Curated annotation (Swiss-Prot):
Main subcellular location: cytoplasm
GO cellular component: cytoplasm
Pathway: Amino-acid biosynthesis; L-histidine biosynthesis; L-histidine from 5-phospho-alpha-D-ribose 1-diphosphate: step 3/9
Disulfide bonds, paired cysteine numbers: none
Positions of transmembrane segments: none
Binding of Zn(2+), residues: 79, 96, 103
EC identifiers of the protein: 3.5.4.19
Protein known as: Phosphoribosyl-AMP cyclohydrolase
Organism field: Ralstonia nicotianae (strain ATCC BAA-1114 / GMI1000) (Ralstonia solanacearum)
Coiled coil start-end: none
Chain positions recorded as Mg(2+) binding sites: 78, 80, 82
Family: Belongs to the PRA-CH family.
Amino acid sequence: MSRKWLNKVKWDDHGLVPVIVQEQGSNDVLMFAFMNREALQKTVETGEAVFWSRSRKRLWHKGEESGHIQQVHEIRLDCDEDVVLLRVTQVGGIACHTGRHACFFQKFEGTAEDGDWHTVEPVLKNPDDIYAGKPGHNHE
């Protein structure tokens, strides 16, 4: 079986490609992660987002601990063929391990001299409740 579509992706020196995850409908950017060839292949095969966890050094099926899986509607490759975009339905409405809708919940406000990052999105569910009883969870 040919997998030439995998060869079109420009993988980095570690065999990874950056992935932007966008919510179908709202177009919110939910998160950023990485995939290796196997993760991208499994994502296509299952219709659910699978990433490569750099900290765990293994495949990471998004939602495997929290239940907040990402159902993939569309996969796109950018013009340089080195970034992947997933358009997903976020099950449970929570993409971030902090219990928020999206990982980009800190907003810069102010000037270059006195600016700071401020939390602008609420926690929808306490991470301790999301991951309670999950052995070895690290809220990724």
